[in-house]
Each structure stands twice: as structure tokens, then as C-alpha cells.
Amino acid sequence: MKRIGAHVSASGGVSNAPLNAAKIGADAFALFVKNQRQWSAKPLENQEIENFKQNLKISKILPEHILAHDSYLINLGHPNLQNRQKSLETFIDEINRCEILGIRLLNFHPGSHLKLISEQECLKNIAESINKALANTNRVKLVIENTAGQGSNLGYHFDQIAFIIKNVSDKSRIGVCIDTCHAFAGGYDFRTKAAYEKTMSEFDAKIGYKFLSGMHLNDTKNELGIRKDRHESLGKGFLGLESFENIMNDKNIDEIPMILETIDETIWPDEIKILRNLIKGN
């Protein structure tokens, strides 16, 4: 079964996120477990933790269908050791917040070399940071999101993600999230059945469907291979609805959170319905 939702607001407290997801007809959602533009935050209060769990029950969304997103500040591949350590500490804090809330998946952008070190050295830094994070936490799966390759961000090519996974010690706690806008920006096409099958065959060969733990379903304002991150509403960008029809009818993709990050949140309920209607037999 396809589990579809959006990256909903946790404004006023994380406990609001499940209710915000329910309002749009979602059976999955993403959220930030703290302010994504600050390095640190006060600990979660016991009442807020309890409210989150209660509201999750009210929403009827299962914990495994939540894809938390880490802070935009974190750079696990940072060229500077001190800055990389700062990122790692914040990353570990966010993993622990997920653990406390009962969230099983934390999505993150791999990292950036900032044009100060080689791509290979940066990828090694990322893998090393992940290993340290895993060694200092429990249970939560760390989900690598492919990037658009904008600037010096890595993770836009399946080979780069495969290298990171190869160098992670505990592969039971590592996963991948495919962002369709980012993938298209990185040169991966979804628009026809043949193009989709080629892209996903390459993903399976280089990474493996077994690591696919979530998806971000976004159309794009840019053409194929431009390496710019510009989201668009479903069907209004260069990917078009056929791309999403191919995804929604892929039987290899089931029971993972499929998250909208499209630009107009007022139409998320409609976009969720569109995605469900694309499934053949519905």
C-alpha cells in the first residue's frame, strides 16, 4: 500500500504535526523535530512527548510512516573537523529526539565539500560521521536523501550514495530517500515508463530497493540535469503527472512514507488525492 503525506508544520510543538497530517488526509508525514535553522533547542518536555504519541494515535498514522527531516545546518561532510563535529552533535541530538518520540526514520542531506576538499574526501567524512552517529544512538534508521547537486552538495548521483552506504558499518540502520525533483535535477528521468524503469534499474543495481525507505514527491521548475533545486506543484513542472503515475504503480515501492514538499501547501489534500487516483485499480 502506498503511504502518502506531506512535510507538515510542527509550529507550536511537535505534537501538532500528526493532527496537521490528518487534516490533509495523509497516512504518512514528515516534520522537523526541532527548529531546523538553529543548532540547539531545549529538550522535549514529557507532556509534549506524550501529546505527540496520543495525537499520532488519533491520526491513525503509524510511527513507521513518519519521515523526520534533520536541520538544514548539518553538514556531515564538512571539510573542517570542528565544524563537522558541531554538525555531528546536532545530528545525534535529532536522532535522540526521534527515538524519544518513537519515530523510526530520520532523513538527511549527505553533506557538502564547500569546494575546499575533494568529493571523495567529503564522501569519506560523511560515512565516518554516520558511523559515529550510529555508534552513539539506538534503533532510528538514518535515511540519506539524494540531492539536486546544487553548489557543492553531494549525493546527487547514485554512485555517491552507494559509496556512503558501502562504508557504513551497520547497514541495518541506513536507508535512502529519493526526492524526484532532486533526482531529475541530477539527470535521472521518470517521465516515460522506459525512462522510469531505466532510472530505477540503475538505483536497484547500484544501491538496492531494500534500502529505499522513503520518497519526496515533488515536480520541478527546471529541465533534466540542470542541478538546481526548484520544487513545483504536481503536474505543473517538467516531471509531469506521468512520472508520478509510474512511481505510484511501482510494486517495489510499498509501505514507505511518500512525502509531498510541493510549493503550495493549500492544495496538498488535492495532490494526495491525485496521487491515490494515479494508482491503477483505485
Swiss-Prot record:
Entry-linked InterPro entries: AP_endonuc_2, AP_endonuc_F2_Zn_BS, Xyl_isomerase-like_sf, Xyl_isomerase-like_TIM-brl
GO BP terms: base-excision repair
Keywords recorded for this protein, A-Z: DNA damage, DNA repair, Endonuclease, Hydrolase, Metal-binding, Nuclease, Zinc
Cofactor remark: Binds 3 Zn(2+) ions.
UniProt cofactor(s): Zn(2+)
NCBIfam families in UniProt: nfo, PRK01060.1-4
Family named by the database record: Belongs to the AP endonuclease 2 family.
PANTHER family: APURINIC-APYRIMIDINIC ENDONUCLEASE, ENDONUCLEASE IV ENDODEOXYRIBONUCLEASE IV
Protein name: Probable endonuclease 4
Biological source species: Campylobacter hominis (strain ATCC BAA-381 / DSM 21671 / CCUG 45161 / LMG 19568 / NCTC 13146 / CH001A)
Gene that this sequence comes from: nfo
